[in-house]
Regions:
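Conserved ABC transporter NBD signature motif
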Residues: 65-73
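Conserved coupling/switch loops of ABC nucleotide-binding domains, chiefly the family-specific signature
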Residues: 63-66, 220, 351
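Helix-to-loop junction immediately C-terminal to a conserved catalytic motif
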Residues: 57
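ABC ATPase nucleotide-binding domains
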Residues: 83, 89, 93-240
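ABC ATPase nucleotide-binding domain helices that frame the ATP-binding cleft
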Residues: 50-53, 153
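Non-catalytic connector elements of ABC transporters
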Residues: 261-367
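The feature captures the beta-strand-to-loop junction immediately N-terminal to the Walker
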Residues: 42-44
Length: 367
């Protein structure tokens, strides 16, 4: 089911005398999610991603804008009429009911022409359980399950109504690191197996990039960039996106462009044709450094971390915004850990320039 958002906006009015002005939680969200794709809404806490999800679900009414499922305008429809499956951050399972009863609950509350026979309800419940691989837990209570198993029950309950769109709100935030990795792989498998158009909300960029077909990066209610995860990582539209994506984080420097060259400190570190003379912010991905004894960029060496397949060189520079520069190089490199300085050349495709307002400045690297 294709999902289309047109100028979707949610504004909360001032709460009362002496309060701050109106809060724009989501501002002019335009987006089309192709049928059967998994899209990650990504951004820091308070950026509007959960509000956007609740607008799609129907739990909130938009201030303006439209929501389409396929060609149907569902903006005015209540949640139960939209055909959505929702999985909340805290799962919202009924503790006194078995897994089977929790999965059946949405079906038992259908009325009128939508009401199903008991046989059909059981069939659907076991089909959903099979998809999430919990058939052997149907007689258990939620308190007897691990966090990952509870998550699967919540997903099965959302799937049992055969929704047109599946919505997941921070579904992994309550799990430990091992279960998060395992469960996000399960979500990807389930989405591919069912083919349901899915919107996944998270503040964890690694989660979003690892399982999403597309990601939407948000800040202060405004969409910053939309695209395939690797595309957004490789070609950030602005400094916020560049800094938000990537682990370790991108290295950010105060720089300037003079005569087609990027200067960081007193060193000309890269040729950047097509850019006017100006002060810039230069951002360099950790993998954008090449160790070179006569390299153009000199930093103070503070440490080396050998990680097996690669090495992280930790350094400092007076023009760097980060507390430490982290440069990832291949394990075949030999770093003199006793040295006080380390020199690099920079990979042009891993260097980004931004203006004072944070917008990307394109440049042509030297041949």
């Amino acid at each position: 089911m294709k999902l289309v958002l047109k100028d979707l906006t949610k504004i909360y009015p001032p709460r009362g005398k002496g309060s701050a002005g109106a809060v724009v939680a989501v501002d002019g969200f335009d987006f089309e999610i192709p049928d059967g794709k998994l899209v990650g809404l990504l951004g820091p806490s308070g950026c509007g991603k959960s509000t956007a999800l609740n607008l799609i679900c129907g739990l909130l009414e938009p201030t303006r804008g439209q929501i389409f499922f396929g060609d149907e305008d569902v903006t005015e429809l209540p949640p139960e009429k939209r055909g959505v499956g929702m999985v909340f951050q805290h799962y919202a399972l009924y503790p006194h009911l078995t897994v089977l009863k929790n999965i059946l609950f949405p079906l038992e509350n259908l009325r009128g022409s939508e009401k199903l026979s008991k046989q059909e309800m059981l069939k659907r419940a076991y089909e959903a359980a099979r998809v999430v691989q919990i058939e052997n837990l149907m007689d258990s209570k939620p308190s007897e399950l691990s966090g990952g198993q509870q998550q699967r029950v919540a997903i099965a309950r959302a799937l049992v109504k055969r929704p047109r769109v599946l919505l997941l709100d921070e579904p992994l935030s309550n799990l430990d690191a091992r279960l998060r990795l395992q469960t996000r792989e399960e979500i990807r498998r389930i989405q591919r197996e069912t083919g349901i158009t899915t919107v996944f909300v998270t503040h964890d960029q690694e989660e979003a990039m690892s399982i999403s077909d597309m990601i939407v990066v948000m800040k202060d209610g405004v969409v910053q960039q939309i695209g395939a995860p690797q595309e957004v990582y490789d070609e950030p539209d602005n400094l916020f996106v560049a800094k938000f994506l990537g682990t370790p984080p991108i290295n950010v420097f105060a720089g300037r462009v003079e005569a087609g060259k990027l200067f960081i400190g007193d060193e000309a570190v890269l040729e950047v044709a097509g850019v006017e003379n100006q002060s810039v912010t230069a951002a360099i991905r950790p993998e954008g450094f090449q160790l070179d004894e006569i390299g153009a960029f000199t930093c103070a060496l503070t440490g080396v971390e050998v990680m097996g397949r690669d090495i992280t060189v930790i350094a400092t520079h007076k023009a760097c915004e980060n507390a430490a520069i982290r440069a990832i190089i291949g394990a075949e490199n030999k770093v003199d850990t006793a040295a006080k300085q380390v020199r690099f050349n920079l990979k042009p495709n891993k260097v980004f320039l931004f203006s004072e307002n944070g917008e990307r400045i394109p440049f042509t690297p030297s041949k």
